[in-house]
Amino acid sequence: MKTYKIALIKGDGIGPEIIDEAVKVLDAVASCCDLEFSYEEALMGGCAYDITGDPLPQETINISLNSDAVLFGAIGGAKWDNLPREKRPESGLLRFRKELGVYANLRPANVFDELINASSLKAEVIKGVDLMVVRELIGGIYFGEPKGRDENRGWNTMVYTREEIVRIAHQAFKIAMSRSKRVCSIDKANVLDVSQLWREVVIEVAKEYPEVELTHMYVDNAAMQLIRDPRQFDVMLTGNIFGDILSDEASMLSGSIGLLPSASVGAKIGVYEPIHGSAPDIAGQGIANPIATILSASMMLRYALGEHGAADKIDAAVKRALKEGYRTKDLAQYDAKEVCSTSEMGSIIANYAAK
């Protein structure tokens, strides 16, 4: 039996509720896959600030680095919006990513046939969409120096090094090898020097993956093509700010952010989390959709632990639950046969995953 240590960071708002359901499903799939999980909880976000005065206590970093993976819920809320920037929950998350050395954000976007009417786009446009946005996470304009402002000007600097581009490109090509073997690198090489370097380095890395087809696209065109014909994409490789925008755009292809997981991975350890926020307005009501967090646990099994069979079981269980008409409140208007609470949806998926 394989044993894995998982750090649980439940966070704020609906975070504790959705993490509990993901753990329920992990334990269910462990029972039939000869796996065992041990969990250690840690604080981050507003809840951490309330208890310790710091949105990211050192203990949380230590627990995470001593684990095989981190399963994370969500942080933030209006309660903490007026704190100094360095004390806000979001500041803790940025520091957390830096401490763990995560540099790649993986955002899958696929469309469940059972929920095809939830999308704003026509069914014939999105049916069969299955893409992955691979976004560089700790470089680019969000972190470049110099940056600042005075009364009349503000400035930021977009910087990428060859090393940063090489490692994110390898991540994208390795993922493509397990998918449809196509990478589209997104840049703005027609006007940005940094994008010209990006494109040159990606072309160099591509030579190590001759089975993978590489194409290039300017970011403005990519934003349009995601709406016009999203099925043309398999793996979309891009930098921090472009990926920030494109991954949010791609997330709406499915029609609900409550369905979509993500991973932030690097040399040390990976963090697996839903793409949605902490939704404090519905916290404690038992109506949050846990599917994105459950699918984040599946990504954790696949990319952090190499347990592809267990991940496949969770993915199939989610699909079965949706096919049979189970819906949480956010999806109730889309062919629901039974509207479930957060806990009920977790139990249904756990039951299917255990078979």
Swiss-Prot record:
The keyword Kinase does not apply. Pathway: Amino-acid biosynthesis; L-leucine biosynthesis; L-leucine from 3-methyl-2-oxobutanoate: step 3/4. It is found in: Cytoplasm. It is an enzyme of class 1 (oxidoreductase). Mg(2+) binds at residues 220, 244, 248. GO terms for molecular function: 3-isopropylmalate dehydrogenase activity; magnesium ion binding; NAD binding. NAD(+) binds at residues 77-90, 277-289. Keywords: Amino-acid biosynthesis, Branched-chain amino acid biosynthesis, Cytoplasm, Leucine biosynthesis, Magnesium, Manganese, Metal-binding, NAD, Oxidoreductase. It catalyses: (2R,3S)-3-isopropylmalate + NAD(+) = 4-methyl-2-oxopentanoate + CO2 + NADH. Its main location: cytoplasm. GO terms for cellular component: cytosol. InterPro entries: IsoCit/isopropylmalate_DH_CS, IsoPropMal-DH-like_dom, Isopropylmalate_DH. Binds 1 Mg(2+) or Mn(2+) ion per subunit. Pfam families: Iso_dh (PF00180). Its EC number is 1.1.1.85. GO terms for biological process: L-leucine biosynthetic process. Its cofactor is Mg(2+); Mn(2+). Catalyzes the oxidation of 3-carboxy-2-hydroxy-4-methylpentanoate (3-isopropylmalate) to 3-carboxy-4-methyl-2-oxopentanoate. The product decarboxylates to 4-methyl-2 oxopentanoate. Homodimer. NCBIfam families: leuB. This is 3-isopropylmalate dehydrogenase. The lineage of its organism: Bacteria, Pseudomonadati, Campylobacterota, Epsilonproteobacteria, Campylobacterales. The gene is leuB.
